[in-house]
Amino acid sequence: MKYSMTMKALLLFLLIIMNIVSGCGGQQSADKSKLQVAASFYPMAEFVQAVGGKNVQVTTLVPDGAEPHDWEPSPKDLTRLGRAQVFVYNGLVEPWAEQALEALSERKIIPVEAGRALFTRGGKQDPHVWVSPKKAIVEVQRITEALCEADAKHVDEYKANSRAYIAKLEQLDKQLTEVAQKAPKKVFVTAHAAFGHLAEDYGLRQLSVAGISAEAEPTPGDLQRLIITVKREKVRYVFFETLTDPKIAKLVAQETGAQTAVLDPLEGLDEEGRKQGLNYLKIMEQNIANLQKALNE
């Protein structure tokens, strides 16, 4: 997604607003005893909170239920970012991030591109690194380094929290490794190609209805080829996700006799999910259970 004069106008407006906010005590809602961290979208926010614990106040820019690939910051969102001491973002999902940081350069915000150098797979750039526990561990380690840099007083707590959370990610890694190794099938089908890193890291093969972007629409030819492949591979489940329209995934399932199930790319958590007490770890456990079922039938 390329930004036009609209984005530039927003950034200019942001600078004006930030000057007004600075002179009017606009940060009163922030707890000054805590490190102020802005996170681009849900998984980044959860990783920050897991490491930061009681010593951080996390602002998530992309709201609950929104698709982060489609989301663009408003002037209000950019103002919220301008109040942060640390900004954690994945990379590639947030094409607006670099321009926003450049406009806010005088704020001395510490930027953390948690997914940097992890994106390439199969010669392509794929941002969905957080859905692989192996790469999520790397992201958490980078977030830990940034929090320690920004807040030296609580380094020991950040490192202890990080070790505890990474131990839980390592347990997910172990579970997924066992599922993938023991499964008679190695192919699974998803609504969009959000699980390529997971597939690559665990010796599986992802087939997708749409491309890496959730916005991508498959052509009739793409659909026909996928339907043929699903029948040939005897795939019993077509996975869809919670934040996008499942109609195409359901069409493929209908044409092939497969069932549908959820494989959540963890791009966001809606209000219902929060009410249920869901989080990254619990949703990944559900994903692993659903994958296990699909790969063994």
Regions from the language model: what does each represent?
Residues 10-20:
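Bacterial N-terminal signal peptides
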Residues 19-297:
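Extracytoplasmic metal-acquisition and chelation regions
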Residues 2-11:
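Bacterial N-terminal signal peptides that target proteins for export
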Residues 1-2, 22:
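General N-terminal leader/first-domain-start detector
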